[in-house]
Amino acid sequence: MALSALSTLQAAELPITKNSPIPDFQNRTQDVAPYDFDAPPQGLFRTITTAEGFDEELGLHRTHEIVPVKPTTLFSPDTQAVFIVFYLHQHYQGFQVFGRCYPEAVAGLDPTVVIGQDAMHIALEDDSGYLTLSPPKGAWKPGRYKVEIHVGEQVNEMSLMGTMRFTIVAEKR
């Protein structure tokens, strides 16, 4: 009985805090930058880059690590493939990374039509990967291309993570 009286006495002595408005606990809009889906993806991706190729190396924990070879955003029209190589933060389930290529500023091509795409399944133990984009109809036309990066089980309006860009430069004569 004496123990419960003591705890009641201590509880009664606690100060009462004022009711704070909910905005005091929320992020202020001026402190939060909006996410840009028209820029390289962030969040899940530690790094992501376009490259002329990739190598597979043995990682720190004896895992397969995909590393870019000759990272660049400028390619020649005779390039056999453009690679998008990425490193991921830790994740807790498998998923797919999709790349959908559009001709953003290429003469004679509709910028709304997908001209190439690739997907890679990422297993739980994977921390890197790559996408391969082959030229449409055998050769790249000079101009700027954009690649939408999607993550999930399928491509839809909610799976877009960001956009990568590369340029095919005209050959020097």
PLM regions with names:
Residues E157-R173:
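Short beta-strand elements
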Residues P111-E125:
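Solvent-exposed serine/threonine-rich low-complexity stretches and specific carbohydrate-binding patches
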Residues K137-P142:
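Surface-exposed, short loops/turns at beta-strand junctions within beta-sandwich domains
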Residues G143-H150:
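A short tyrosine-centered beta-strand micro-motif
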Residues A123-S134:
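Aromatic sugar-binding surface patches on proteins
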Residues L14-G59:
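A eukaryote-biased signal for short, well-structured alpha-helical docking elements
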Residues G99-P103, I149:
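Conserved aromatic beta-strand anchor motif in extracellular beta-sandwich/beta-rich domains
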Residues G59-Q93:
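Contiguous beta-strand segments within globular domains
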